[in-house]
Amino acid sequence: QQRVRRLSQRLRLEAETEAAGLNAKPGTKWLILSETWCGDAAQSLPVLAAVERASNGRIEARVLYRDENLDLMDQFLTNGGRSIPKVIQLDGSFAVTSDWGPRPAEAQELVQRIKSDPERAHTYSEELHKWYATDRQQAIQREVRELISRA
């Protein structure tokens, strides 16, 4: 939670991301499945919260604990796993329009590449943390803009 606070304080939305929030379809809803221990959530939740604020009420977000909502989580698996965070985007009629998560595509590819190498698999957490530190939530912002465009 300290990481979430720190990232929230220094986060600056790109103009394009702020505009995407402002131009989101009214009634857009995000159900975000997460857990407090999740490192990927610590990186993405500040961005999602900032976009919700920037949307002036066009996007309404709710965070749900994954482990208390496994029936929902099991409808949005990533490669067969309950990977989080997972954003489920709904329209004003509560129909699913899209989903996103658990991390940006580039980071997901990095994790898969590292985990597939037995000599490097134990370093995946450290390597992912370095990637996030270098990227500074830019990929998350790009992919959240894409998510909003599918509303």
Residue ranges of model-derived segments:
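Short beta-alpha junction loops
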Residues: Y65-N69
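Conserved redox-active cysteine motifs that mediate thiol-disulfide chemistry
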Residues: T36-Q43
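General small-molecule cofactor/ligand-binding pocket signal
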Residues: E60-L64
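Short glycine-rich or small-residue beta-strand-to-loop segments that form or flank ligand, phosphate
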Residues: K29-E35
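Non-globular targeting/processing and membrane-anchoring segments
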Residues: Q1-T28, A50-G57, M73-S83, D91, ...
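Histidine-anchored nucleotide/phosphate-binding helix
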Residues: L45-A49
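Short, conserved acidic/polar surface loops in the N-terminal third of protein domains
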Residues: Q43-S44, D74
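Conserved beta-strand and immediately adjacent loop positions that scaffold enzyme active sites
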Residues: K86
